[in-house]
């Protein structure tokens, strides 16, 4: 095909059907020689200017914000994997994180008041409609590992959950040492939502291995008891404790009442 005829065909396609996603016709062409590639570079603009013709590398950049793309995300509970379906048909499944340049290439190319520089040649481009056996350059979505808050037994998902100090929940941490110890960190017992400061001070309490799991299982299974009962239960299971150097309760229950509890059998 002569270069003049190719230029005329591309310009006609460029002028027709300029709206997404209502456009239905998709044209795919490849510049197999140097002259054809030069014509493509002259006619095809960056995605900010033209949305009809684009290069494969431009597909990795974010799309326009004015239109919607139909998609569906499915979660696999067995291995905590997420599958992305585009248009209800195309399935994207990934098993490794993308390389760092691919994640930030569009951010580095954008400048205030200008347009993005678009790469016109791509060495190896694999369509997502026919996934190959290679595992490079794919993305994995997994649940973020929660962490326990210091003052209460609340999960912190960095924005996914609100952290509020709770008087009915506390944190138990067991250390795998010769002398198995459990650290109890209590939060405020008041019902006021404005009170978030810790109202307890506790030191290390020596516990046996079975007692640690007994306290955790009992508190997790039954949430109907008051905070005072849970606190007494924690001390009740603390058998074989030779020393309780310091256990201060402020404004709720007297220290003498808790230390007078019998030792578990």
From Swiss-Prot:
Organism: Arabidopsis thaliana (Mouse-ear cress)
PANTHER family for the chain: TUBBY-LIKE F-BOX PROTEIN 3, TUBBY-RELATED
InterPro entries membership: Tubby-like_C, Tubby_C
Domain of life: Eukaryota
FBD domain location: 228-250
Ranges of residues in domain F-box: 1-44
GO-annotated molecular function: DNA-binding transcription factor activity
Name of the protein: Putative Tubby-like protein 4
Gene3D superfamilies linked: Tubby Protein, Chain A (3.20.90.10)
Family: Belongs to the TUB family.
GO biological process: regulation of DNA-templated transcription
């Amino acid at each position: 095909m002569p270069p003049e005829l190719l230029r005329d065909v591309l310009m006609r396609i460029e002028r027709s059907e300029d709206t997404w996603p209502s456009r239905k016709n998709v044209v795919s062409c490849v510049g197999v020689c140097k002259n054809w590639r030069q014509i493509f570079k002259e006619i095809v603009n960056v995605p900010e200017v033209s949305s009809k013709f684009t290069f494969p590398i431009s597909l990795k950049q974010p799309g326009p914000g004015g239109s919607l793309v139909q998609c569906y995300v499915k979660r696999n509970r067995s291995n905590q994997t997420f599958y992305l379906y585009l248009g209800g048909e195309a399935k994207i499944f990934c098993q490794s994180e993308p390389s760092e340049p691919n994640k930030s290439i569009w951010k580095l190319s954008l400048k205030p008041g200008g347009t993005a520089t678009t790469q016109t040649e791509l060495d190896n481009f694999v369509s997502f409609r026919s996934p190959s056996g290679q595992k490079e350059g794919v993305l994995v979505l997994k649940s973020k590992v929660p962490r326990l808050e210091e003052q209460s037994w609340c999960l912190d998902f960095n924005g996914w959950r609100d952290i509020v100090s709770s008087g009915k929940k506390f944190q138990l941490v067991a250390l795998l040492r010769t002398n198995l110890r459990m650290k109890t960190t209590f939060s405020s017992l008041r019902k006021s939502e404005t009170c978030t400061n810790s109202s307890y001070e506790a030191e290390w309490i020596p516990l046996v291995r079975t007692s640690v799991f007994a306290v955790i299982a009992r508190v997790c299974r039954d949430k109907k008891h008051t905070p005072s009962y849970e606190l007494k239960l924690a001390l009740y299971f603390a058998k074989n404790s030779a020393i309780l150097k310091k256990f201060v309760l402020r404004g709720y229950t007297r220290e003498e009442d808790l230390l007078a509890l019998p030792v578990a059998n």
